[in-house]
Amino acid sequence: MAKSFASQGDLSEKTISFTEIGRDLWAFTAEGDPNTGVIIGDDSVMIIDAQATPRLANKVVEKIRSVTDKPIKHVVLSHYHAVRVLGASAYDASEIIASQTCQSMIHERGQEDWDSEFARFPRLFEGHESIPGLTWPTITFSDRMTVNLGRRRVELMFLGRAHTAGDIVAFVPDEQVMFTGDIVEYHSACYLSLIHISEPTRPLYT
């Protein structure tokens, strides 16, 4: 049975899992809550989606430190939604990466989305006082970007409108693993916000 996503009536803590899904590739999950991907390279770590608050992000960091002491240098934002990005400051990464469209949506809708998700998902925003503000990318790209973590290559790709107008995926060629943000759901219907109904399957076949 699929786990329900956090809501106003969902105040119980979820069981955290930290699962290796490929060589030095990890998935931080918590029974249907927003997840985080972890890519460990030769010399550094990349985070895919940052969690809703620094409090939750620190739980990710704790799990990372159980498997590596390499520095976290990159945080990748798959899209702009508050529950996935506002924990970014906890990683102390030198670069925060997103699509140009995602950056535009943070400008246009970031505060509105923060206010909305804060009201709808109170459990995810426990400890919200530590959020320093909206999460702003330091690097953006239009279509594709390659990040080298030593010998490990990560391909970041904007494949068209999907869950939002600016979603990206992260592909790790050496393990054939892709992190998809909210474009793909497991045992659950997609969370519909600004989804583009006519286009969401196209990126999966690109």
PLM feature spans:
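Active-site metal-binding motif and surrounding structural segment of the metallo-beta-lactamase
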Residues: 18, 42-44, 54-98
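Divalent metal-coordination and catalytic microenvironments
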Residues: 24, 39, 49, 64, ...
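Short catalytic-loop micro-motif centered on adjacent basic/acidic residues
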Residues: 27, 46-49, 73-76, 155-156
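Active-site environment of divalent metal-dependent phosphoester hydrolases
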Residues: 54-55, 80-86, 103-106, 164-167, ...
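Metallo-beta-lactamase
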Residues: 104-159, 173-174
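Single conserved hydrophobic/aromatic residue that forms the stacking wall/gate
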Residues: 195-199, 203-206
